[in-house]
Amino acid sequence: MTLVEYSETLKKSLEEFCKQDKKVVTPELNSIIENISKTGITCYPWNILKELFYFKLNEILDIFEKEYIATSSTTTTSTTTTTTNTSSSSTNSPQSPQSPQSPQLNVNIKDEEMQKIKNQVNLSGLIKMKKEFLDSFKESKLSPFTVQRLCELIINYKMYTSFSKYLCAVEKMLNVSTLPHLTPEEVIEFNKNQNSGSRLNSSTNTTTTTTTTTTTTTPTEKGNNDQPNLDSFAFSSSFTTSFPSDTTSSTSTSLSTDQEMKDLDVEQQKDDTDNTANENESK
């Protein structure tokens, strides 16, 4: 984690830089840009910090402009050389007095003229965009919301190989809402919160992991917990049902059997009495 750097010494260096006629960006001033590119926090007054950014952007855009002009000149020179060679070969070749000029020569001349016009239009347009951007930047009252990205573009400008692409990239940074810079007291508080926040997040993550491990319930356990305990119903003294129990059924069956046996005994005794009476009568 990168903390916000603030010191009165750097602030004085910024103030002195603003007063210089021939400005020189020291390593200490470059460290301010590098710190903002990592934290996104501006803790120095924008009116002095803006001078540093303006100088660096103007310097970088000048580099791109010179490279663009040099590249355009090289392209034009190459085209001119090709045209000259074609013209010389056409002149050296035997031609009749009535033969017209070579069509290829006409095409090369037109291409050269179009390339010159294109380069002039592009260069004038880019220079105009550059001037408008720098003027708007110098008039800004607050740091852009994307100041972190702006610092990254200042530090890593060599990643861009095109003048137009870099100019469009920095121009977008200025068209975003602005925010006030932090005071020195707010910087101290911000750094404290960053440190305590990292410790709090690590402890919270550990607690959350432990709680999750403890309270995790498998689908089988959850299903068993949702089902009622059948034993508490089957063996509860207060449990009732509309169906007779097995004990009641067996008791009723036993009583019926005893009654039938008694009835059979009575009938047997009656039969024995009748037989005895018949035997006496025969004698």
Curated annotation (Swiss-Prot):
Serine/threonine-protein phosphatase 4 (PP4) occurs in different assemblies of the catalytic and one or more regulatory subunits. Probably part of a PP4 complex containing ppp4c and ppp4r2. Residues 75-105, 192-283 are annotated as: Disordered. GO terms for cellular component: cytoplasm; nucleus; protein phosphatase 4 complex. Residues 75-104, 204-220, 232-257 have a biased composition (Low complexity). InterPro entries: PPP4R2. It comes from the Eukaryota. Belongs to the PPP4R2 family. This is Serine/threonine-protein phosphatase 4 regulatory subunit 2. Probable regulatory subunit of serine/threonine-protein phosphatase 4 (PP4). Residues 259-273 have a biased composition (Basic and acidic residues). Residues 192-203, 221-230 have a biased composition (Polar residues). GO terms for molecular function: protein phosphatase regulator activity.
